[in-house]
Amino acid sequence: MALALSGTACSMGGSESPASPTRPALAGGTLHLALAAKYVTLQDPTILDPAAPYEPFDRIDAEILRCCLVRTLLSYTGLATEDGGTELRPDLASAMPALSQDRLTWTFRLKEGLHYAPPLEETEITAADVVRGIERTAGIERTATVSGSGGTVSGSGGSGGSYSTYYSVIRGYDSFARGETDSIPGLEVVNDHTLAVHLTEVTNDLGYRLALPGSAPIPADPRDPSAPYGVADGHDEGYGPYLIASGPYMIQGADLLEPSMAASAQPRSRGLTKRSLTLVRNPSWDRSTDELRGAYVERIEFRVMKQAEAERGLDQGTIDTIFSGSSTKQVERYLADPELAPRVTRGTVDFSVGYTAMNLAVPPFDDVHVRRAVNLAYEANRWIRVTNRHTSTASGVGPLGHVAPDATEEDLLRHERVYPFNPAAAKAEMARSSYDENRDGICDDPSCKDVFALETNLGFEKYADRVWVDGLRKIGITLNIRRIANTDKYTEMSLDPTTKIAMNLGAFWTADYPNASNLFATLFTSNGIGGQFYGNESLVGVGPDDLHRWGYGVTSVPNVDAEIDQCLSFIGFAQTRCWAELDQLLMTRIVPWVPQCTLEYSGVRSERLVRFPIDQALDVWPALDQIAIAPGSD
């Protein structure tokens, strides 16, 4: 599949807006959701705080904020990648931003007449509120009092967590975050409905960054309009229970909040407790001003319970879906029953990639023919079957045949499989290498024996690694696999180039947002060596001085810095196509990885749910603003 670059590097791209969601006759009712107590907690003080550290795979509330409680300048529809769900669209903004010729200034025009939820229903959302939200995100990060995860589900790769990762490119952001200034000069309020964002460097994925929860607007404090963080002032340990919504829903009881009182004396929204969360319709929200969200149901109720209790409720119809996911046993039971099978929704987590990294500075992997041979010798379908057999969650894993998660490339390479399992072709590639002297397809060099392979140790690996051992033995490579149960230790070893790990079997990456810029600029440049969570294990782009300093005998490795810089110079869909082309180049000419898998999603829904889309723009969750209930079933 060859992709030709198209489009202009000076256009923001994105979609102006989809067709407005048509409110069907089946709209209304209460959506009943379960949260498995084993995986999720509502006791974290940072729950529903837009400024809390952002980890797309960790935070269940990222979806709740997007779908229901806050609006941002740009956002997403809550649909699957294939349905355009990962395309940026205007939300608070009336259109996609205008960019200056040097692309260092992005100007957003906000929609007029948008108001906050009660008790501030008379307060219009303005550009100053967006500035206030970003400044609070920077300030909270400085004080480090908001440090939770918004309800932890699992760990992740990616570069998420610190918002400075995303917003440091805004002029003056870092100085403000360090407490050196009292404002961010790069955030210019031109007027109530116009915001100009001034950057220190060209950042063509800024739109995705401003769609994150940390840029959500915060209204001014009616008691003290000069309060730097508005109604969130004084709530450094967690703003969620006091949040004034801008989306189609609000927390039950939020209309009784008293933002004019001192923060310490303010009552919490009664709809957020340690065991439950209830969202109700925001009467200030107007469907005609929101082209992204269907917001069909009137009320959404979450309850924390044991997994077994949640699954019984789903079977009995008292629970509509388990937001944190059903067990493998429940999914398999439904799939085995022809009447129940249609109630299972399956799909891929288009945000993640699991891969094996080959170190291009360690023989025999300094030879591209060996790296191609390894890809061809890897029996992907068998590895996936074994892994899923020994994984307890219903999500499981599915195949991925290229580098970047599909959501970051708008599905351009979804069906790409550069190296299907082919033992004969693997031997042919090995025979072309400098490590097969007699050209019989089997490596006969000592470097192919006892190859150091690092692996995680979550439980399934001792079974799945047999696929690697069997496949590589046939081309003359034997592995010395070291499994590390401690995640911190595994990460420390992965990030240290002096460990000379030849193959890293447990590498994993989760995108921060549906754009591949972070992945390529981290995992395939020297900037990704050390200090990054799951960085550049393959050492692509490392210079000769570093290779010598780290004790490698190899003096050069492939470099794609120029290709990455070219892609970074594009914007919108032109950049997306460029990433897809670079993905293909890496897989065919550089071959630093064996792409192994993406995570899969399996969701069971009640019979009365007649719409059950999956949001793939912020990882993968049921899209609560797009779910609908059959009329008369409440």
What does each model-found stretch correspond to?
Residues 32-101, 243-250:
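N-terminal lobe/hinge region of extracytoplasmic solute-binding protein
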Residues 24, 372, 384-387, 414-423, ...:
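Extracytoplasmic/peripheral linker and loop segments enriched in polar/acidic and small residues
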Residues 77-83, 156, 181-183, 192-193, ...:
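Gly/Pro-rich hinge or "lid" segments in bacterial periplasmic/extracellular proteins
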Residues 49-52, 243-246, 255, 535-546, ...:
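Tryptophan-rich aromatic "cage" segments
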Residues 391-435, 456-463, 570-573:
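Structural transition elements
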Residues 57, 95-165, 196, 303, ...:
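Aromatic- and charge-enriched surface segment that lines or borders ligand/interaction sites
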Residues 272-276, 292, 433-511, 598-601:
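Ligand/substrate-recognition segments at binding pockets and active sites
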Residues 149-163, 169, 252-280, 289, ...:
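Extracellular/periplasmic solute-recognition and catalytic clefts
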